[in-house]
Amino acid sequence: MTSAAPILEIDRLKTYFRTAHGPVKAVDDISLSLGPGETLGVVGESGSGKSVTALTILRLLPEASAHIEAGKIVFLGRDLVHLPKKEIQKVRGRMISMIFQEPGTSLNPVFTVAQQVGEAIKLGGEHSPTKVREKTLQLLQEVGIRDPERIMGSYPHQVSGGQKQRVMIAIALSCDPKILIADEPTTALDVTVQAQILDLLRKLRDERQMSILFISHDLGVISEIADHVAVMYRGKVVETGSVLDIFRNPKHPYTKGLLACRPRLAGDTRRLLTVSDFMEVRKNGDSIEIIEKQVPATRLAELQSRGRERLLSPRGELTKLGITLPASNATFVPEDQSPILRVENLEVHFPIKKGVFRRTVGEVKAVNGVSFNVYKGQTLGLVGESGCGKTTTGRAILRLVPITSGKVEFEGKNFLGLRGEELRTARRRIQVIFQDPYSSLNPRLTVETALTGPMKTHGVGKNQADRRDRAAATLEECGLLTEHLGRYPHEFSGGQRQRICIARALAVEPEFVICDESVSALDVSVQAQVLNLLKDLQDDRGLTYIFISHDLGVVKFMSDMMAVMNGGKIVEFGPSDEIYRNPNNDYTRKLIAAIPDDSLSSIDRRQQLRQLHA
């Protein structure tokens, strides 16, 4: 943090996209400044203009469809808007570098890590093969990659998501830039890897005296790294301030909504507040009017406490497992009630094949002796990092992957032994909502076909007209409109697509739904809406869920019971509130510690440490 002159100043910038329906004002008259060695956090939902702002700084937008309508971008005394192409190319990478959200698609799959980092070093003017290799090794060590010699010879698909992002950071640092633009660099990562990347960026910023423009949709992440914050909404900056001021005293209703919609580990929140609880938006021709809702704090607290208590497994079952019973705020399943789903000693092993003849040389125990019960109306949360076995467990229950051994009983029947019509009937009653709403909907099918197709397969509805009526009713239940039936997936936002996926799962009237990372691809504000919807549907329809996620905060909010998975095993099991209050396993404690801490005391402490080391 510094009081020196800004290294980057954006003054009244306007970036528009040309469309058949007129210009889209993606960035609409914004002004920002970034000081030397400072981190500016830019936060907002998808479509707010934050990423377009970053791309505009480096003039990376396609000239055929986008143009800078007005404004200045002054970097070290030069206006980047009017620089010739050759001059702006000297700025890109060398003076201002950028890392993107998805490291898997940012790296070229046909080149090794060494080749890709080396190429960036050569662009900076170093051409000696020996020196390029030495600097590549040094950069990989600097960004915290273990065994950098091995990683240098690896291809992107051979390294983890966290390692890929570290490689991207190494590439960005290769020419010693003054500014690093980090566009959602942790969104695609597990919470523990996210914490490591944030630590790394802080360390690099301080050691290199580098400025960072950090873009995110999550104010919790912003609180961990930023000195100042700019909140963007519909192309405009609606609020700016120090990170402590923004969290302590937010002025704009949109900022208040973003702060309120994140699931918190502390407390017993049964319903998440959303941006719409704080403001409404009216469109008057081309202008947008934001009206703040003056909702008393007591009313907001009442909204958060609305909903049923936790539904815990029978007391006797928990006592046998040695689990501490909570004092209040919970209802127990009756002792004589049988589970709707029973999983016993589930094993899923995948063969490791090598050589020309693809001989099996070993196996990966993706799921290794997993057992649990789920009772009707309950939500069991499966939480853990990527590779822990949680998604494979869900897919094994659905019989989407081969099971090595174990039992899966649904309503007392051996689900693994079902065949023919019995299996078809059971599959109608167990549905799944996948992680990515973009890839789980067929782009060639209308919403109506996506919903009525499964109904026809499972014999739901008398005829096509009846199925269409049912689809329309289900869409409305999920917060969409009947007229959406005739549209295609590309015409919807990410949150709307996930609502369509939920409606598709519910269209065949299931009793049990497996939600596999079903909100991890969404902005936190949209995530809150979808989580509330899932809870409402559970209450209205009496649904039972298995809720899979890497985010302990989300799982705690959604779940009655929680199973923490690591290395294919359940390492901790119990009531979700109790696991947060009193975790018994080191891995669980690690997951909890990795969640961004946006309490005022923690933000204040981080800022004081920054002041001391400035």
What are these model-derived regions, one by one?
Residues 237-241, 570-574, 582:
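ABC ATPase "signature
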Residues 4-6, 146-149, 243-340, 353-358, ...:
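Short catalytic/signature loops enriched in Gly
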Residues 174-178, 507-511, 527:
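A short, proline-enriched helix->beta-strand linker immediately N-terminal to the Walker B motif
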